Amino acid sequence: MKCVPGLCSEVVSVIEDFIRQKVAESGASGVVLGLSGGVDSSTVAYLAVNALGPDRVLGLIMPSSTTPRDDLRHARTVADELGIESETIDIDPIIESLTGLCSHNANELALANLKPRARMVILYYHANSLNRLVAGTGNRTELLLGYFTKYGDGGVDMLPIGGLYKGQVRELAGRLGVPPEIIKKPPTAGLWHGQTDEEELGMKYDLLDELLCLLVDRKLPVEEVASTLSLPPSEVERIASMVKGSEHKLKPPEVPDIWEVMECSH
């Protein structure tokens, strides 16, 4: 029996109501989101248009030299099919400018993280200029694993699909009418040439979803999760360490507790 449940019919209306509520509470005029051409951003775009209408949704397509051509084409397809305003901004000049200002050479991780952080800056520039909120496109699988960049693609105002595992997002995308070629293609963040999420994570999303559901939602011990999924305990431990090690990404910056000391000084 699968741990990750199928989607009930109310999920779409709950998420769309959530988007409408957050926009109304903030007094914003709509949302801005990054369109990567992947299933997550496409799904959020469809939900946002259903919730707010196409005139209140702006899609920013922000490719770099490592963005697959299919992703760029798919992002434009989504914008065209939904009838939303879109803008394409090449982020390579921004990356080159920033790295040129530093006195030391960046390692691969620093360079990879710079791309989503540059995109975050562009998203908020547009959001602030247009009185809109930034709608994030992260899913529950990515959030639990910390598979996102702190203050990059994690820097958003709301996460409409943040409660859904990757497989559930694919299911929802199918219901919403996202093109099948987008749903079925291997997910990639396009951080370097040939990069795919599942190769980097070392596990297929379907299996990751089940593992995380058993480990986090049902709180089963590592040994039981490993037995249930016929995995080596070391693999479950590896994922558990990723979850534990990335908890800081989901929390605000920590502040020292100084009030007791201040009160004692009187």
Curated annotation (Swiss-Prot):
Catalytic activity: deamido-NAD(+) + NH4(+) + ATP = AMP + diphosphate + NAD(+) + H(+)
Entry keyword set: ATP-binding, Ligase, Magnesium, Metal-binding, NAD, Nucleotide-binding
Signal sequence region: none
Pathway: Cofactor biosynthesis; NAD(+) biosynthesis; NAD(+) from deamido-NAD(+) (ammonia route): step 1/1
Gene3D superfamilies: HUPs
Organism superkingdom: Archaea
A GO biological-process term: NAD biosynthetic process
List of residues binding deamido-NAD(+): 117, 150, 157, 248-249
UniProt cross-references to InterPro entries, sorted A to Z: NAD/GMP_synthase (IPR022310), NAD_synthase (IPR003694), NH(3)-dep_NAD(+)_synth (IPR022926), Rossmann-like_a/b/a_fold (IPR014729)
The enzyme's E.C. designation: 6.3.1.5
Binding-site residues for Mg(2+), renumbered to this chain: 40, 142
GO molecular function: ATP binding; glutaminase activity; metal ion binding; NAD+ synthase (glutamine-hydrolyzing) activity; NAD+ synthase activity
Positions contributing to ATP binding: 34-41, 137, 166, 188
GO cellular component: cytoplasm
Similarity field: Belongs to the NAD synthetase family.
Oligomeric and partner information: Homodimer.
Function of the molecule: Catalyzes the ATP-dependent amidation of deamido-NAD to form NAD. Uses ammonia as a nitrogen source.
Protein name: NH(3)-dependent NAD(+) synthetase
